[in-house]
Curated annotation (Swiss-Prot):
It is found in: Cytoplasm. Its main location: cytoplasm. Signal peptide: none annotated. One of its GO terms (cellular component) is cytoplasm. Keywords: Cytoplasm. InterPro entries: DUF2129. Belongs to the UPF0298 family. The lineage of its organism: Bacteria, Bacillati, Bacillota, Bacilli, Lactobacillales. This is UPF0298 protein LACR_0404.
Length: 103
């Protein structure tokens, strides 16, 4: 055990990802979308797919996706813009419930 060399551990860099919703005219073209990002979900009935793409590549990819013949429209997810701290909402809800129970 003493002969094992200690190697430097490199830090793990997590790249920011963005959700991109791609609406298509038909379901046939959704297979081709895997070239542009990771397909997380695709709906046959609603003809849309959810891709996750690196944040720094979004602007170029949106233009490329819009140029495809089978793509109807492209939307970017807004989860990064939303406040995800729900503790204040829970406190407010608890206070409202307590007030209703007291009356």
């Amino acid at each position: 055990m003493e002969n094992i060399e200690k190697k430097e551990i490199r830090p793990l860099y997590i790249r920011e990802r963005v959700a991109v919703y791609v609406y298509c005219y038909s379901y046939k073209g959704t297979r081709q979308l895997s070239r542009f990002g990771d397909i997380v979900y695709s709906s046959q009935k609603s003809h849309y797919s959810l891709l996750y793409v690196n944040n720094d590549e979004v602007a170029d990819l949106l233009n490329k996706l819009k140029e495809l013949r089978f793509v109807k429209k492209v939307r970017v997810g807004h989860i990064k813009e939303l406040d995800q701290n729900f503790s204040e909402a829970f406190i407010q809800t608890n206070l409202e419930v307590k007030e209703e129970l007291e009356h």
